[in-house]
Amino acid sequence: MLDKTWQKMYEEAKSVQKFRQISDHLEAGGVAAAVLSNTGRIYTGVCIDTACTLGVCAERNALFNMITCGENHFKRVLAIMSNGKDGAPCGACREFMVQLMEKDYKNIEVLMDYDREEITTLGELTPDWWL
């Protein structure tokens, strides 16, 4: 069984996942994410999709919230897709995470599937960084 922290992260991400059409060119909330900072605080974010591709993924949005609140390091991340399933961060999110925690990124835990309790690490998903 997933520990209580994973469960709380999942619940908090689910609570902000509210799809909404903001304008003819912008929608938000289809995907939601939660990150666990090294201090134990959970930060959430939702994806923001725009017609001109200037949107942002839920994972990066959650990390931006963490950074805005003065924290710079995290140890866990999860994302809930629009179909209710969990999934791996996209390439852009992985790149951002690696740049944020260049020396420690390989140990960041990623929830791949809540129902199957499948967890991997960012190091497994991104074994070699291009820089």
Q: Where are each of the predicted segments found?
A:
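C-terminal binding/interaction regions
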Residues: 1-23, 71-131
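Short connector loops at helix/strand junctions that flank enzyme active sites
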Residues: 28, 57, 72-74
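Short beta-strand scaffold segments in enzyme catalytic cores
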Residues: 28-37
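Histidine- and/or cysteine-centered catalytic micro-motif in compact active-site loops
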Residues: 36-38, 47-48
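Hydrophobic "anchor" residues
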Residues: 41-42
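Compact, glycine-rich, soluble single-domain proteins
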Residues: 46-58
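Short amphipathic alpha-helical face segments that pack within enzyme cores
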Residues: 57, 61, 92-95
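Feature captures the catalytic cores and cofactor-binding loops of soluble hydro-lyases/lyases
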Residues: 61, 65-68, 89
